[in-house]
Curated annotation (Swiss-Prot):
Organism whose genome encodes this protein: Rattus norvegicus (Rat)
Principal place of residence: cytoplasm
Similarity comment: Belongs to the small G protein signaling modulator family.
Protein name: Small G protein signaling modulator 3
Isomerase is among the record's keywords: no
Organism ancestry: Eukaryota, Metazoa, Chordata, Craniata, Vertebrata
Keywords: Cell cycle, Coiled coil, Cytoplasm, Growth arrest, Phosphoprotein, SH3 domain
Amino acid sequence: MSGNHTPSASGPFSALTPSIWPQEILAKSSQKEDSSEPEICYDEFGFRVDKEGSEPGCSQMAGTPLVEDPPQRLRWQAHLEFTHNHDVGDLTWDKIAVSLPRSEKLRSLVLAGIPHGMRPQLWMRLSGALQKKKNSELSYREIVKNSSNDETIAAKQIEKDLLRTMPSNACFANVNSIGVPRLRRVLRALAWLYPEIGYCQGTGMVAACLLLFLEEEDAFWMMCAIIEDLLPASYFSTTLLGVQTDQRVLRHLIVQYLPRLDKLLQEHDIELSLITLHWFLTAFASVVHIRLLLRIWDLFFYEGSLVLFQTTLGMLRLKEEELIQSENSASIFNTLSDIPAQMDDAELLLGEAMQLAGSLTDVAVETQRRKHLAYLIADQGQTLGTSTTTSLSQVVRRRTQRRKSGITSLLFGEDDLEALKAKNIKQTELVADLREAILRVARHFQCTDPKNCSVELTPDYSMESHQRDHENYVACLRSHRRRAKALLDFERHDDDELGFRKNDIITIISQKDEHCWVGELNGLRGWFPAKFVEVLDERSKEYSIAGDDSVTEGVTDLVRGTLCPALKALFEHGLKKPSLLGGACHPWLFIEEAAGREVERDFDSVYSRLVLCKTYRLDEDGKVLTPEELLYRAVQSVNVTHDAAHAQMDVKLRSLICVGLNEQVLHLWLEVLCSSLPTVEKWYQPWSFLRSPGWVQIKCELRVLCCFAFSLSQDWELPAKREEEKQPLKEGVQDMLVKHHLFSWDIDG
């Protein structure tokens, strides 16, 4: 029976926000008849309580219930009344400003602790999260909607970590727990809003703790405040530059505030960051007992990352004597690792932290950060790449501007000057997003396959480059080698056979026989079953595992999850909306029409087809493959395969882009589409990218990608047809065995 079961005062789940109370568990606990099942006990925060203690840092803190101090609550109420209530009547939260004026009085109140019932409202105001929520162009609901379609590496990793984040808490213990879908939405929304960060396990721990005490939307905006304001940039990025820098700053502060401990760490050559990096990355979430965490976070949301240093120094100071008396390095390391779990007195810890490092200022920390960041980048410069340093000053948020409603535009029009500015800004952003997506793909190739490191990533904008595009396209066939990739292992039994392992690249010498080809691998020549390999169409580039989505999964996410959305945004820029409600409006429809129109134009002239036959290469069927016809055939191929699977136009567009990358003609296809002037004018506004000279710049940017060899599956997003795939391979092998009289092989084995 569903109902609104309420926890008892100071009982299990009583400290949580009401919307996350696990009603099933509360219902069971209220029915004492079911005494046959062993009862699982939970504390007021929803953590399992047993003899060993399932929660991090279980200590004497777990034995005392969380009870608000009435005088403390009165002091807070008096402060808020005095500073905010200028009207006669009761003070309510909607009358309190979105941010609290900073003062010494407010700091002393925060240091003494915030009443638990007031934390959700005060945390939002102290951190600046409420201000962000009010000022945001997009609502949390809209961000969640935008992020729900992102199938990227981040989304996959989030799914893997959902049940690992807080398994000992009833709200996140299993798939059906009430907090799991909330955590999923918050983390996916953050990954969408901060594409350079994506997902980091540290954000998952912090978000899960926030969801225990705040509503989902408020927890999201709190995370935004943490990422953008409370912590330095790149704290949660893939490089972890921000948090690594803070570990070096911490070592500097230990030299200053705890010289005896510094000497001990140097003597035993102990790398403190192996322990403390996790403390900083999670802002102590899952590191200390939840009650101590609440007190630390009260200060953290008011003063920012300075509190992380002060708290860590306070912990180390309290255990300094024990560390100095340790006998060996292992003992010191274990003692350091156990420090957070042994912290059971919030007043003692925070008092020690403020007494020791209360004079520490943001200016001092920031000065050290700049210095150590420079050292860190110098040390890791080769692996970080040149673009990393430019993004450390701030966290880059995805542009989130709400579009005017159609009715508003019709009734009141648009501010022409402002609209023009917005369009210019939007164009710049679109090019920047595409450029970043291309660079991410390029860096993937260079990191995965070193032979790509010499590729020039700076686009060539010269006029001559466009003429060379078609010359290079024609020249591809002249340097073309026929090679194939092994689909499975083939063991060599006779001298005339060619053995290979799955994913080996074989040079094809002869394809005269339908079933058995002759090839060369590592200096050896021999025959092999044709069905055991897949012919590579490498154009003028050598095959690279970095571009093969059957070998390297990451390239799929970079292309379909990053590059394709950036290209789609360009094609959507200035796309005319349908005049009738319900009319379709998608770049795919424009591409279909433009590709068909360009091919029809060539079909009108027999002479032009004869010229094209001499100019461009022919495929194995003798068909002319100009860039225009290659585009047309690719569109038709995608339609045939994807319509059968009822795929959406977004999927079709992504698959077409993958084909263009495989053929190394994506930039030429853009030129074909933009040169179809009647179609472009029909589908696009005059200020759109595709009707402006700006498309030439996009073509130059895309040309960089033709330097890399892609082997992407056109049907990657379609349901797999396993039965149909397996049968032809076996039949082909049977034919080959019959032909060569190799009946001694057990083909069913």
